[in-house]
């Protein structure tokens, strides 16, 4: 495992069939992050090398670092790196009710300029299939970001939930609210 501080340049590791996956976590979420990583590796193709990058704002405890190492040490086809982003996040306004880990995914092109493609995953989900299926999906190269429609939000917008309609129309000012995406699984190109 490697640890990087603010502003460090990170390059993809020198392996064949690399799949780069980024998560953002706090100390309180490391147990969930370990489960997410374990599920990626358990179901992932043994032919691929998983380049796992965990973004964080506060230093993790040694116990938390040991937990992540225990999980990744079970597999020989992964690299784990921790990237501190606290200085980068200081420059941005963050709403009080939303964790900064939610916002950091939007900075991935800036944080990882040496990457052509990364998958961003929330650090509290379980991957039940080989994530290489998502990695190798053909995508139009004019696209910067791919995500899945957030059917719950779209349903609220189209239904009787006035506050959601107001939020999307007047706060977010989305011109196509039916294309609102869920941000827990994203592909950046």
Model-inferred region functions:
Residues 1-189:
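Glycosyltransferase catalytic domains, chiefly GT-A lineage
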